[in-house]
């Protein structure tokens, strides 16, 4: 299995490549944007204390029947209700937050820390997988970092989120 640093670098490069879709034709500008995305993802991962998974790794774990808690951090009506990774539970977080923000500043809506912990479960050694829409969306970072602060030991973020999941041709569920 890859080291956390290797996994972070690999995921950063993969994730950043998804971000290039909207970049200009100038290869130098594209490289600057790729670098910014890669560094931001690496910094968030390091600051949050969680690990990264690709959608392919998540799908493999799901296919093997591994017991995972999968959390979709996108808004219920606009996203989760329409499509989500099969088996995922929903708890919406905000896109942007700062270190030290309190709970009400990182959660979208009226969800409480107790409700989020109830979704994650009492077993803090069980793998928790958190995703949002795409690499630049910070919702999954906010949720993963919070789960780590609550003592969950195997917290994973899928940076490509539902866009990468669909891009890989994997099935989605809807409410």
Outline where the language-model segments fall.
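Active-site neighborhoods of enzymes that stabilize oxyanions during catalysis
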Residues: 43, 169-175
